[in-house]
């Protein structure tokens, strides 16, 4: 009897573990397709040697993105880097379950070495209000200059404000008073490719063979099974279309290999941009201010001297 109870307990535990594993897999798949988590998992550096940001591997459509930073900053100061990801707020994308929903956005900000996310105690109330409830994180624990955010609701955060702390060359010997490049990548909407290379339901599906569409079966949970009578070998090919894309073909139609079976439901896309920022030497700024002050004083003295000379000339003429 005891052995039987032990067996039943082990059986229940096995089922529970199986359910938890399945939940983990489903959740992981959903998250990994959400920019920019996938890039963190699959790439040591999000920017390739060619300058291309790897997020474009999953988000195939090209869309604009913009970044605004100050022209120059002083050492050890907090400033804003504003990333703008514009899109039509009325658009609804295809979700993983095939239904329509709002678009999310995400971004990766690649700063020069030494620049990093500002600690909470250094962020002013004004900047804190602009950042809202956003949760920023480093791309890697050892890469504090690369910051990622998302996915977050695009209707609320199409403009992302990153609070950035500039380095101090007096304490950081790797930092220098120079002009530096800043790179940004930003997307709106879901990707078209999953981490394992398979397609998401947010892309176009094409025929895998040439032939006649003999059957289109609408699946109970959405999506289609399309049977194609292959003209090359006389066999049949079944193409699976997940929920989301809309069919463009019908039964009895002759189609060719790679011909689109569905529309392309993707409304989002990825873009990248860059900007430049100067880490300004405070002594140079003070020197410039002193120079400007000396020029202004020289102009004032020149005007006074000129007026004094005119008075002397006028007095001599009266004599």
Swiss-Prot record:
Transmembrane segments: 287-304
Main location: plastid
Cofactor(s) this protein requires: heme
InterPro entries, per the entry: Cyt-f_TM, Cyt_f, Cyt_f_lg_dom, Cyt_f_lg_dom_sf, Rudment_hybrid_motif
GO MF annotation: an example: heme binding
Residue positions binding heme: 35, 55, 58-59
Function: Component of the cytochrome b6-f complex, which mediates electron transfer between photosystem II (PSII) and photosystem I (PSI), cyclic electron flow around PSI, and state transitions.
Entry protein name: Cytochrome f
Source organism (scientific name): Pinus thunbergii (Japanese black pine)
Gene that this sequence comes from: petA
